[in-house]
Structure formats: C-alpha cells, structure tokens
C-alpha cells in the first residue's frame, strides 16, 4: 500500500510540473528528509554534522543551523528524533542541538535506550529511559514551536490510520499540536522493540483527543522523502512567503534525503526452493530487512526518475550506504564498538561516489548543496527586505 501511495504522489507531482516554468533559486522550497533505522541514525547524524559545518563555513557564521536553511525537515523513527533535535528551540529560540551534538547523544544514551527489559514476553525494550531522556531534552515544547516546518510520522493502531505531525496542519487539526517528546517516542515505538504510546491532547472545542501510536515506519516505511515532499507542497500553498509559487513542482524544490544504510546482500541470500516451506515465524526473521531495503530503493527510484525527467536532477540528493555488513545492519546494537563502526560508515560514505553514473563524491555533492542552500537563503532575505 505504501508503494502504491508513493507512486500516486509521484505521478501527481510530474503532472503538476509539465505546465510550469523554471524557478529562480530564491523561490525554491528546501526539504530535508531523514530515514528511520534505530541506532543507525548515527550515519545520517554524521552527514548532518558535515553539512552544517559546510553551511557555517560558506556563510562565515558558527551559529548557522540546519533549521535556518530548510523549509521542511521530515523524519521517521530515529529520523523523527533527529528532526526534533535540530528544530526544537532552546531558551534563546535557537535549535537546542547543533548537528555536532547528535552523535554524542547516541553514544551517551543509546546503550540505555537499547537495554533489554529482561522479559521474554512483550517488547524487547520497556521504553522508560527513552521517554525519560526525551522529556529531559525536549521539555514541554509543542509542534507549533518548531523553528521550521516539520513532518514526523506515526501510526495510530486504534484508528488504523497514519498520523502526520506538522505545523501547517494545526489550523485545521489543533489536536496535532502535541508535545515533541510524545511525538518522538511515538515515531520510534517500533512494534516488538518498544511499547506503543498513548497520550491525549485537546480539539478546538476542548474535547479530549486520544492517540495510540507506533513507529512511523508502519505508515510511511523507513524513507519519509515522499511524505516530506507532500508537506512541502501544502506549505507552499498556505505560507505567505511562498506566495509567488502557484504550483510547487520538482523544479522549485531542493531535496536532501539521508538514509541510515542498507545492504544489498543481507546477512544471507535465499532461493525460492529453500524458502518454499517457510512459515510466519521463519519469515519474520528476515522480512523486515528485506522490506526496508526494497522500500528505500523504490522511493529513491521514483524520485530520481522524476527529477531527471524534468532536467532537475541536481535538485535531489540521496545519501545512502548500500553495503552495510555485520553488526552495522542491526537497529539496536548500541555497543560502543558498533557505534564507532557506524560513525566510520558515515565518514567513509562522504568519500564515496554518488552513483556509478556520477563520479562526484557525497562530500563534493554536499558542498554544492550547501552553497545552493546558502545562496537561496540570501536571495530570500534580500527579497524580504524590499
């Protein structure tokens, strides 16, 4: 179903683009999307640290933060946590976490978040420490206070519907103005890993509105890029600063999508003959990795095709490691050794080519992207001053 919905969104965006003209850089909408993947969030965190450093260098401003440059930041699961960390304001109304603070956060708190509950029944982890640290870091901040538009997904197991937390939806659905720590726990509450999360807010007329939520990947798979694009499309329709954009399309968008790594080989390959007699229990051991890798590949395929078809391929950058091995493939191995390996994966990824057809390294591509983000921010600021 997620693949069908993704394809529908893709077709809609292509059709909307056919009658449009090229956008100037100052009119472009900028989108950052961060995949889910548990402790593997260290990989995109390493990439974000590099990008924020480049933005600071280009603009000669050590206080520059990612939220200053992106109109929409979307994330699922651990990507939702990263989204909250770089968009939640501190007491001076700046992001409470710089990108360089995220990897140390994983090292400090990861081992306690992924500490086994010791029970053979129920979820693998009780989630108590995760909630504790989220409340400590995010405080009472709610969605409307985010420093830029956010798109954090979850899934309500009582209504069987996805729930998308965004600022632009609040006028219509004020009950979505939840506390950020409730949202972050919910998007990370992967079935079998953490308990589902219940909390309540109020509707516009004061009625109680209840949520029963699990991991956002249930609703949007691990790659939330298409979700983030959808939110950007709506934002362009309602935000006055995008008044010059009559119909948002790929020519008017800069999209950076960060993965948490996958593997083309898994831990083992299988044949049809070998798996013919497998039952539910045996498939459950491997299906999550298979579906996660496949859905991530298909989303990237859709987006690459759309941007290339409209001669806007430089507007989209997917940063993904496709050759994870061993413990780095695990969502919950928060050992010191494995976390160090994940940092190394992120650092090594910067030196790799974007694709077989594009010899540009990710490091070079991100430097180019940083320059585009900086130039676009300056153009918009100049336009606003008139």
From Swiss-Prot:
A motif (DGA/G) lies at residues 215-217. It holds the Pfam family Patatin. InterPro entries: Acyl_Trfase/lysoPLipase (IPR016035), PNPLA_dom (IPR002641). N-glycosylated. One of its GO terms (molecular function) is phospholipase activity. The keyword Lipid metabolism applies. Transmembrane segments: none annotated. Residues 32-229 form the PNPLA domain. Residues 1-23 form the signal peptide. It is an enzyme of class 3 (hydrolase). GO terms for biological process: defense response; lipid catabolic process. The active site is at residues 77, 215. It is found in: Vacuole. Belongs to the patatin family. Patatin have a dual role as a somatic storage protein and as an enzyme involved in host resistance. This tuber protein represents approximately 40% of the total protein in mature tubers. This is Patatin-T5.
């Amino acid at each position: 179903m997620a693949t069908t919905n993704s394809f529908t969104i893709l077709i809609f965006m292509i059709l909307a683009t056919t009658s449009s003209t090229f956008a100037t850089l100052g009119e472009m909408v900028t989108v950052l999307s961060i995949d889910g993947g548990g402790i593997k969030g260290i990989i995109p965190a390493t990439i974000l640290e590099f990008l924020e450093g480049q933005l600071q260098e280009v603009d000669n401003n050590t206080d520059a933060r990612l939220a200053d440059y992106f109109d929409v930041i979307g994330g699922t699961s651990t990507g939702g946590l990263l989204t909250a960390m770089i968009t939640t304001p501190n007491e001076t109304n700046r992001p409470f976490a710089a990108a360089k603070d995220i990897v140390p956060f994983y090292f400090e708190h990861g081992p306690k978040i992924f500490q086994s509950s010791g029970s053979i029944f129920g979820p693998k982890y009780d989630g108590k420490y995760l909630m504790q640290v989220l409340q400590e870091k995010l405080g009472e901040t709610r969605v409307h206070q985010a420093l830029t538009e956010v798109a954090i997904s979850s899934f309500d197991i009582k209504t069987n519907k996805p729930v998308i937390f965004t600022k632009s939806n609040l006028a219509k659905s004020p009950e979505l103005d939840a506390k950020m720590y409730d949202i972050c726990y919910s998007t990370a509450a992967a079935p079998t890993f953490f308990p589902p999360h219940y909390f309540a807010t109020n509707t516009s007329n004061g009625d109680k509105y209840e949520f029963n939520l699990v991991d956002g990947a249930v609703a949007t798979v691990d790659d939330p890029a298409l979700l983030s694009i959808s939110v950007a499309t709506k934002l362009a329709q309602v935000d006055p600063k995008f008044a010059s954009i009559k119909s948002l399309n790929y020519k008017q968008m800069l999209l950076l999508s960060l993965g948490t790594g996958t593997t083309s080989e898994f831990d083992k390959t299988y044949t049809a003959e070998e798996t013919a007699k497998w039952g539910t229990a045996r498939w459950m051991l491997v299906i999550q990795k298979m579906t996660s890798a496949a859905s991530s590949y298909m989303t990237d395929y859709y987006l690459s095709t759309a941007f290339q078809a409209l001669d806007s391929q430089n507007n989209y950058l997917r940063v993904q490691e496709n050759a994870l091995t061993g413990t780095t493939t695990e969502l919950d191995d928060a050992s010191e050794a494995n976390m160090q390996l994940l940092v190394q994966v992120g650092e090594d990824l910067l030196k790799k080519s974007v694709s077989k057809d594009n010899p540009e390294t990710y490091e070079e591509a991100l430097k180019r992207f940083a320059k585009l983000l900086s130039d676009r921010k300056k153009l918009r600021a100049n336009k606003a001053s008139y």
